[in-house]
């Protein structure tokens, strides 16, 4: 094999690994209950593939804290991350209820309808409401 063939083979292997890493990223990771900030993150592999995921944690004061924490996780997997927006989530597991609302001052408002669709993949038996009201 010449150098070009070896390089091409190596790049295909890296691309396959990043595709597998992307496939392994959970769509939803949020706090088990309470009211907390969330961000939508577009996770991108080494090629053109990407997926939107939802992250929200009660222990994070700012939307940027959530993004920074998760971006480090994605970097270790060889993935890139972009944040198109955020908001807040009210999570009441006893009532099987989620409410998505508000916006991020730093990132802007996430697409709450898309957030609802993504949350429904993990919480199919929940009532999920969205609102453009509130901060």
From Swiss-Prot:
GO molecular function, one term: protein histidine phosphatase activity
GO (cellular component) term, any one: cytosol
Active site: 63 (proton acceptor)
Ribonucleoprotein among keywords: no
Keyword Thylakoid: no
Binding residue positions for substrate: 37, 104-106
UniProt keyword list: Differentiation, Sexual differentiation
One matching Pfam family: Ocnus
GO process terms (BP): cell differentiation; sex differentiation
Function of the protein: JanA and janB regulate somatic sex differentiation.
Family: Belongs to the janus family.
Protein's name according to its UniProt entry: Sex-regulated protein janus-A
């Amino acid at each position: 094999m010449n150098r070009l063939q070896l390089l091409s083979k190596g790049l295909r292997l890296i691309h396959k690994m990043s595709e597998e890493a992307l496939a392994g990223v959970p769509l939803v990771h949020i706090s088990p209950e309470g009211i907390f900030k969330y961000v939508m993150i577009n996770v991108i592999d080494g090629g053109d593939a990407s997926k939107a995921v939802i992250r929200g944690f009660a222990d994070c004061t700012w939307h940027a804290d959530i993004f920074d924490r998760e971006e480090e996780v994605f970097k270790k997997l060889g993935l890139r991350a972009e944040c198109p927006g955020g908001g807040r989530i009210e999570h009441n597991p006893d009532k099987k209820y989620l409410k998505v609302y508000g916006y991020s001052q730093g990132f802007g408002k996430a697409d709450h309808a898309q957030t609802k669709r993504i949350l429904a993949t993990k919480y199919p038996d929940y009532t999920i409401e969205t609102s453009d009201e509130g901060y």
